[in-house]
Amino acid sequence: MLNKFTDFIKIYCKSGDGGSGIIHFRKEKFINRGGPDGGDGGKGGNILIRGNNKLFTISHLKYKKHIIAENGKNGGRNRITGSNGKDSIIEVPIGTIVKDIYNNIIIEILNNNEEKILLFGGKGGKGNCHFKNSLCKTPFYSEKGESGKEFIFVLELKILADVGLIGLPNSGKSTLISMITSSKPKIDNYPFTTLNTNIGVLNYKNFKKIVIADIPGIIKGASKGKGLGFEFLKHIQRNKIIVFILSAEVIYYKKYYNIIINELNFFDKNILKKKRLLVISKSDLLDQELKYEIIKELPKFEKYIFISSFSKEGLYELIYYICNILS
């Protein structure tokens, strides 16, 4: 589990300066001053960004907001070119968007090991060996290296989770993700226990790992910024499957179901076009008659499963349903 989830950060980046070319003349026996042989400066290091499917947050960059690449080295005698500066690579989760401070999208990282150059390093300056000509046999000048580029980037993460768990506060989302993945979120009996998106990975039989995101509880008006607001709803946009969760403890199932549907519809209508499943949690509190009453209240077109993290009812059915769709 990621205790300190971060999905938005600003970082200052500077690529490396190019090394300078040098002024140097060949020295040989019996020759006081030979021809120019000053080498070129090395190229400054680039700033790159790389996708890493083992990362699920950009929290590791929270206290490293200055990324500076190495400068190129100056040239040497005998026309030796200075070594290039080392690149600085920013590792980010899949689904990271890179913007400028005006919110314009620059690039998006969508694949593991996908690598993009954010800033090129400065070019190395030329040594004096380049400036010899018929009019000037002994040039006493060389070029300085080009300065590196500076820029402030905004990194925003939209999680590329396979499954998004959505529900009202205290509906049992965190308990569910702790039961079917290795995630251990904070769980308590009060609303908004989940203050950040929790990420868990489900490993089941021969299926590839399945990433599940527990989105903080949605309340009426969430799409307009109420409660924890829409800042977390953006993570749902990239989920392949949406799992709606209603607690068996609520009384008006249809009402709370409609709150979730309406908020998602206001935020992004395309979310409701995704594969989805309705889960009634804490079903150990229900007898068969109450389950039947709930089913009558809910829309007939919804696929639903009753689950209990206490009795384990429905958990394997839920896992199988998710795996079957993703396969």
Swiss-Prot record:
SUPFAM superfamilies assigned: Obg GTP-binding protein N-terminal domain, P-loop containing nucleoside triphosphate hydrolases
Residue ranges annotated for the OBG-type G domain, each copy included: 161-327
Domain Obg: 3-160
EC number, UniProt record: 3.6.5.-
Gene Ontology terms, MF aspect: GTP binding; GTPase activity; magnesium ion binding
Binding site for Mg(2+): S174, T194
Keyword Heme applies: no
Primary site of residence: cytoplasm
Positions with a binding annotation for GTP: 167-174, 192-196, 214-217, 281-284, 308-310
Taxonomy, superkingdom: Bacteria
Cellular component terms (Gene Ontology): cytoplasm
Leading EC class: hydrolase
Transmembrane segments: none
Compartments, record wording: Cytoplasm
Cofactor(s) needed by this chain: Mg(2+)
Entry's Gene Ontology BP terms: ribosome biogenesis
Assembly with partners or alone: Monomer.
Reported function: An essential GTPase which binds GTP, GDP and possibly (p)ppGpp with moderate affinity, with high nucleotide exchange rates and a fairly low GTP hydrolysis rate. Plays a role in control of the cell cycle, stress response, ribosome biogenesis and in those bacteria that undergo differentiation, in morphogenesis control.
Family listed: Belongs to the TRAFAC class OBG-HflX-like GTPase superfamily. OBG GTPase family.
Entry protein name: GTPase Obg
Gene: obg
